[in-house]
Amino acid sequence: MENGEAKQSVPLLTPYKMGRFNLSHRVVLAPLTRQRSYGNVPQPHAAIYYSQRTTPGGFLITEATGVSDTAQGYQDTPGIWTKEHVEAWKPIVDAVHAKGGIFFCQIWHVGRVSNSGFQPNGKAPISCSDKPLMPQIRSNGIDEALFTPPRRLGIEEIPGIVNDFRLAARNAMEAGFDGVEIHGANGYLIDQFMKDTVNDRTDEYGGSLQNRCKFPLEIVDAVAKEIGPDRVGIRLSPFADYMESGDTNPGALGLYMAESLNKYGILYCHVIEARMKTMGEVHACPHTLMPMRKAFKGTFISAGGFTREDGNEAVSKGRTDLVAYGRWFLANPDLPKRFQVDAPLNKYDRPTFYTSDPVVGYTDYPFLESTA
């Protein structure tokens, strides 16, 4: 390739070996909810969307995908708990593999970030606690999301939820995915258990840091045993307080999880930068991910507000192995190429992030060739 030299001088565009997977570059497609899976079934247009963002040896993570019928909290997000879901994912995975991509499915349970309209038989959502969530303004800045007060899970119910994650991982492998990412971030069920401002349990799943991390680690253990630890990652956001899920000692929480994950030998740990305290906004912050980075023995992925410049710097200074890009990858299907040649980026269109149109704001962002 004629610009091979230029490529080598861009840290984000250097190859990386992630366990069994040989990555050609370090620009990862972050998991992005897009709400275009009608009736929770992945659609053919998703094959176009993901394959547009695939490069040979590129690593992609799906949008958050529900592990059960109680896992949903948003309109038209995909699932992976039925045979129909598995069959619908297969051509999407095939499209990514046809272009040489590595594709992980992010498995997810929203916990209390839901309302009875999304729940089977109109029941209350489940959580570690019965603490209700305040209404939130949606991303369009107008509509209000209302949450039904959750039902506290009985201790006898928790193994069933762990098993839902295990079965979802098995289904992901049946659909052809290369692995799964456990969604332990952003105020959803796993994060609710970890965070002391939400988890007020008095049994073995609440109280101490170790007890609050018991549920997440049981899921890691079950999923790793089901599909092999070398096909498992986890996403964490210890420093964030999305969906009123903050922690009073996030540094200790993050470090404990990073150290504990080593016992299971999983492939990677994907962490949202401390500067991303709330969704989409960068804040000045004294915390750093370096203690977690140093403690975790597998591949480390950082996400949260990265540009080309600070992504390159994070890799070159050894602060992370890979960098996950969300909004910029959404708007620039050929983001690795643009980073390689330092091309200008398409601006993202926030109003179409979560609309249901199968093309507009989804597969119609221009490529470099078509903008020349």
From Swiss-Prot:
Substrate binds at residues 183, 275. Its main location: cytoplasm. InterPro entries: Aldolase_TIM, OxRdtase_FMN_N, Oye-like. One of its GO terms (biological process) is oxylipin biosynthetic process. The keyword Nucleotidyltransferase does not apply. SUPFAM superfamilies: FMN-linked oxidoreductases (SSF51395). Pfam families: Oxidored_FMN. Specifically cleaves olefinic bonds in alpha,beta-unsaturated carbonyls and may be involved in detoxification or modification of these reactive compounds. May be involved in the biosynthesis or metabolism of oxylipin signaling molecules. In vitro, reduces 9R,13R-12-oxophytodienoic acid (9R,13R-OPDA) to 9R,13R-OPC-8:0, but only poorly 9S,13S-OPDA, the natural precursor of jasmonic acid. Can detoxify the explosive 2,4,6-trinitrotoluene (TNT) in vitro and in vivo by catalyzing its nitroreduction to form hydroxylamino-dinitrotoluene (HADNT). This is 12-oxophytodienoate reductase 1. It comes from Arabidopsis thaliana. The lineage of its organism: Eukaryota, Viridiplantae, Streptophyta, Embryophyta, Tracheophyta.
